[in-house]
UniProtKB/Swiss-Prot annotation:
A motif (Q motif) lies at residues 36-65. This is DEAD-box ATP-dependent RNA helicase 1. InterPro entries: DEAD/DEAH_box_helicase_dom, Helicase_ATP-bd, Helicase_C-like, P-loop_NTPase. Its EC number is 3.6.4.13.
Amino acid sequence: MVVAMATKEEEGGPSSRVPHLPWMRNPVDIDSFSGCPVAHLPRLDPRLVKPLQRMGIESFFPVQVAAWLETIGPGAFERDICINSPTGSGKTLAYALPIVQMLATRKVRCLRALVVLPTRDLALQVKEVFDAIAPVVGLSVGSAVGQSSIADEVSNLIEKSKQGLFPSLDEEYIQMEPQTKVDILVATPGRLMDHISMTKGFSLEHLQYLVVDETDRMLREAYQSWLPTVIQLTRSSDQNHSWSDMNGETLLHPLTTIRRSGVERGFKGKSFPRLAKIVLSATLTQDPSKLSQLELQHPLLLNSGKKRYRIPTKLQSYKLVCKSNLKPLSLIVLLQELRGEKCLVFTSSVESSHRLSTLLEFFEDLPFKFSEYSRLQRESTRRKTLDAFKEGKIDVLIGTDRMARGIHIDGLRYVINYDMPPYVKTYIHRAGRTARAGESGSCFTFLRKHEVKAFDKMLKKADNSSCSLHSLPEESVETLRPVFSSALKKLEESLESEATKKSKSGDKAPNASKRKRTINT
């Protein structure tokens, strides 16, 4: 049953009647929970206290306490959990800690928990959290993110069969199936599908926990149909009447990956532990057609506050109104004001990021170090750039919304929207790179005069009507004009040269004349 309610569409479009699921109408209010010191968290395994302290955690945030009570506490994980909480509120530990605690008593190593995220960077960050707490209770954590070759991943995830080690032994007396080396796997959809399809011994048969992080993005993009595949493979065998996926195509999985019922596996008549799901986002979708893909069981929504969209409580929002042709100069002056503090600068496109980064290179003696962060760069280049930014070797990172999802940078105090975000969800994910884990932070947004009204209206959806106007000294902007004119000419020459090189190499190059017209925006 769904209830139709008059509301705005998910991305801030025109009003329409969008159906809402009944269980979303009465959420548990995360803000009603207080922080809890580590030593006072009920039923916490004592072995986990020291690892948490080494992580610098002295007290748990409300979202972590709420999730704990619904999984380890009275809730006992009887319902699937949906968490809608601002960026930087502590959602990763909110699911990692209960999963580690629940698996701490396992006797036999099997793949029991799967965490799926949209990007490699996010997955590696989540794995770091599990790595910090899981080993102390005897659990092994693996990753399948494409950081290394699939052969290397297989060697880290799967134990070779005894037949391979002792080929002369009679098959009747040895275990033929390769066994997993990990209890918990953090994966990206593409590499997960690779292992499901091709890796012998990779099985979801014993899976007890499935976490879908950044849920709205994971449901919006198909990602090789990973979700229906995982859902089908984790149903018990009496539920699997067909070997066809949603498109009617045959699935290429070994039979051992199908989850057998408890009776089949010798559980003395007891049902197999159900697959518990946790889905999380700072902007969780309310679309029933999307949520139905998850096949949630009696779901419980944990929501931060009454508003659907929330920004961190310690975030200060500012807007800067300027003409398009002065935006690059205004950005430089603002960055000078921030005095070399770490800062993320978001643009509307990869091309815009590249233009802006290239333009800044033609300004000499800037008092800050900057770098471009783009999907067009090699993965190794992006990784080195991000590491340099985290280590303080780079002050300013310029990129697109690829940087806006889940990436955590310690000590990041400032975010700048060089281009106005198109949707409130975009603003939340961008601004949420700062003011994390109870720290303070600031987000500046450059606006043209005609954008101000729409921007103010957008922020109201995020329960944020206090966005101050920030002014820059006009004389500081004017002093940069002579250099700006020279830099623009050099930029045009540089872009023309790049286009020529790409044309000769056969790469598809963006239209050079279009680049010229948009260099100031």
